[in-house]
């Protein structure tokens, strides 16, 4: 996933929009359902943003910010009040290993910090272009993902040393661990799911999804029933629901426009996707063979990533408001429509729940 710079963040407007608007509110109404936006916190500050990470045990929310004053901002997960900042960390994503209490962010070099004190411990040289990041609790290893080779750099969370780099066979987007020694990675440019032996660090299979969609993005995992939820943006946005053990496709369902990151909540048996068009879609797993779209909730345009708070079952997402683009503004990344400058202090964190 590409980090969103402040000038080129995409606004995906409904085709039938009658009155032009450049603020962050989504233009489509919410469907009925149990979820709503519980709280909106105006965090403000300049700089782009990308991933968000929730540390449920420590009750902290991490949001890296870009721009001239790149930093890692830290918030109270319950109140959304600021609790600290790690300066000079302009990253796409962040993660914390719950065993060592070491945090990592996808700067280049990768920054490693003490999650208790927010003090930088060291930097770690890596190749490629660090983007996504996650901790595999199976063996306390941090996976740094890159669209450029090497596609994955695996770091020991305790020592901060690089264990190995991997070629995943294409550009990775979101990855998930089954907690038992297997990692699954949505390969964006190949329309497949890479299956990786997380102990021996070797790719063992690729599940081909090209018949269902291209432009892979989010990936979520139901550990109880061994089910993957793989999201694709083209030709129309869908989630492909897959048997994780053999790659067999169970079914597909529609999603909103511009899915980026997703999560599966085992407490509610729901796969949830954040969508750049200003919505959040909840897929209900009624049984291992029965799935349905439970709700599409209005959030904010640009709120395309999320984090799950496993203690409260709340979802956290974020977005900002933007002015109109200049007449000569160039398209954003991947041909996205141009966007104007960020409205000062409009950056907001949204808490979603029942």
For each predicted feature, which ranges?
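Predominantly soluble domains enriched in secretory-pathway, periplasmic, or organellar proteins
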Residues: 3-5, 16-354
């Amino acid at each position: 996933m590409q980090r969103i710079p402040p000038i080129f963040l995409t606004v995906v407007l409904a085709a039938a929009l009658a009155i032009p608007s450049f603020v962050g509110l989504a233009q489509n109404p919410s469907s009925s359902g149990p979820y709503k936006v519980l709280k909106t916190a105006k965090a403000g500050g300049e700089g782009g943003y990308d991933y968000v990470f929730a540390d449920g045990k420590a009750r902290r929310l991490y949001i890296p910010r870009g721009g001239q004053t790149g930093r890692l901002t830290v918030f109270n997960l319950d109140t959304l009040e600021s609790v600290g900042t790690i300066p000079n960390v302009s990253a796409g994503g962040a993660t914390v290993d719950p065993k060592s209490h070491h945090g990592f962010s996808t700067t280049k070099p990768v920054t490693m910090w003490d999650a208790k004190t927010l003090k930088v411990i060291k930097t770690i040289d890596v190749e490629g272009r660090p983007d996504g990041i996650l901790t595999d609790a199976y063996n306390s290893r941090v996976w740094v993902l890159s669209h450029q080779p090497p596609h994955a750099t695996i770091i020991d969370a305790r020592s901060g040393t690089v264990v190995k780099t991997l070629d995943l066979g294409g550009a990775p987007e979101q990855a998930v661990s089954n907690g038992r020694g297997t990692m699954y990675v949505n390969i964006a440019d190949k329309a497949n799911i890479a299956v990786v032996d997380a102990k021996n660090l070797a790719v063992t299979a690729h599940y081909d999804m090209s018949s269902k969609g291209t432009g892979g993005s989010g990936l979520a995992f139901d550990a109880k029933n061994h089910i993957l939820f793989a999201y694709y943006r083209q030709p129309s946005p869908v989630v492909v629901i897959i048997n994780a053990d053999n790659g067999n496709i169970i079914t597909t369902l529609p999603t909103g426009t511009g899915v980026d990151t997703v999560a599966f909540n085992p407490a509610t048996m729901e796969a949830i996707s954040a969508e750049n068009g200003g919505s959040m879609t909840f897929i209900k797993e009624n049984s291992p063979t029965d799935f349905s779209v439970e709700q599409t909730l209005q959030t904010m345009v640009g709120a395309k990533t999320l984090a799950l708070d496993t203690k409260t079952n709340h979802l956290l997402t974020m977005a900002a408001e933007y002015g109109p683009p200049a007449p000569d503004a160039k398209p954003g990344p991947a041909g996205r429509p141009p966007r104007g400058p960020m409205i000062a202090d409009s950056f907001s964190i949204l808490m979603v729940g029942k």
